């Protein structure tokens, strides 16, 4: 039997097992599973090229593979995710008694960059919204999307997966399904709720909805659920039309939502709950932003700081 073919079959089997492990044991959402499986494909390809079974892979092998991606200038955040995925894969093999120890546990994580998305202020969000022609179905939809992202702090994946049944009008809450299919309840302000209901009743009701898509809130003109990429493109074009010289993505609106809350004295635990952060340390980054804002304000306006 051809050695390469046998190794390929072995890795194909592990690939199926790993995908099942991510879905069932780690309770990962579809987007996360796809990202980790993409990273796994790099490991699989490398191992097959080197004629390595999973149990033959060493720390040195993984370091060489990681160096390859570092030389390609793959972002540190992507490298960290790769390492995280490899660790989960080898951890699965340890559980299955296929290997004794994981070679990935000793990999050094690349330093996480401290770059954060640009923050938009309220006036800039208004400028973005003013670029939409609300007399058109797409314009009214896009205006509403920006309001919901900025007013509720949703991830773009949460927005496009939002269902009609997730809107609790009387309570003024959205039921949001976040990372790992974890549920949380996010307040929605009157303005955002009114815009959403107007869109649903006056715009969405006239869209020829495709089978299976009728449960989703935001649809394209052909009746399909909006994709994340469509929201990215819509916002990018609106920012350019508004003349805003910042790098803006849907995550920037979520980031701006959290920054506004923290800078205006919101309880950090409440912000953590609304954002769906597992760890308070993730939310604490916004307190660091607040300190930077204070420092910059003093530097700009206090006479002793502004002295040369």
Each predicted region: which residue ranges?
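Conserved catalytic core of the tyrosine transesterase superfamily
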Residues: 1-308
